[in-house]
């Protein structure tokens, strides 16, 4: 059994398209429930393949953790309310879990405009220096390993939190630090609209601070150095977007503030 952990908010729950499958359980965590149609909520709650969890707390990571706590499937896939998935790709992923005896798998996703995040055609093991690329919707966890490790998303990071990004990279880092086996596979599990929040890490001071805090959270005493290298690498791209000076000044400010 696979648990599809979906975070949704407000009336977005009304647009969910949840195809029934014999081996799929949907765990829907719903924030700002008062803005949704009661009929839509009632219809979903009545389905035997749906676990509906209303949540009155804020934050995407809080929602993710609530979904993980309520999932009862053997494997839990993190997803959003604007994502669709391939059941055949999930079955292929299950084979990899069995063959490689892994605890956490990451993969890739397509976009509705036909583009893809799939860049590498071979599988590889994750370590602390190659976990930056997977999005939350590219993560599947063996539930047994999750319960054993008690790892959660850091609720200080993610949309609606103090730091609005970085939660998925921190989650993978915590898995690795615990000793879980984490591997990436050349599978496209999900399809997502082409606009993603992770692509914008530079248009506000808080987004830049979040990157600095993330590097510090994961790499401790090496975090400052790795953040500086990140800034140097990304500056040309940010300059093309017209935020070069803003990005650099706030990156420097974040380093000073975190002394």
Model-inferred region functions:
Residues 158-170:
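Acidic donor-binding loop at a coil-to-helix junction in glycosyltransferase catalytic cores
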């Amino acid at each position: 059994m696979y648990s599809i952990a979906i975070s949704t908010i407000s009336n977005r729950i009304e647009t969910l398209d949840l195809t029934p499958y014999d081996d799929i359980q949907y765990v829907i965590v719903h924030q700002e429930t008062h803005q949704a149609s009661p009929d839509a909520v009632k219809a979903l709650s009545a389905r035997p393949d749906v676990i509906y969890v209303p949540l009155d707390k804020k934050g995407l990571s809080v929602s993710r953790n609530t979904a993980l706590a309520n999932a009862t499937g053997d494997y839990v896939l993190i997803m959003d309310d604007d994502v669709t998935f391939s059941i055949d790709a999930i079955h292929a992923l299950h084979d990899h879990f069995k063959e490689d005896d892994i605890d956490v798998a990451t993969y890739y996703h397509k976009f509705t405009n036909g583009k893809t995040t799939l860049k590498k055609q071979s599988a590889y093991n994750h370590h602390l220096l190659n976990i930056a690329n997977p999005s939350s919707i590219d993560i599947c966890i063996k539930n047994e390993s999750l319960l054993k490790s008690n790892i959660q998303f850091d609720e200080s990071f993610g949309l609606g939190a103090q730091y609005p990004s970085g939660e998925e990279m921190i989650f993978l880092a915590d898995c690795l630090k615990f000793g879980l086996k984490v591997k990436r596979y050349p599978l496209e599990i999900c399809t997502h609209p082409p606009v993603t929040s992770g692509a914008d890490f530079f248009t506000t001071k808080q987004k830049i601070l979040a990157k600095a805090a993330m590097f510090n959270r994961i790499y401790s005493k090496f975090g400052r150095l790795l953040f500086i290298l990140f800034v140097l690498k990304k500056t040309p791209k940010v300059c093309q977007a017209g935020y070069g000076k803003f990005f650099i000044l706030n990156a420097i400010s974040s380093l000073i503030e975190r002394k």
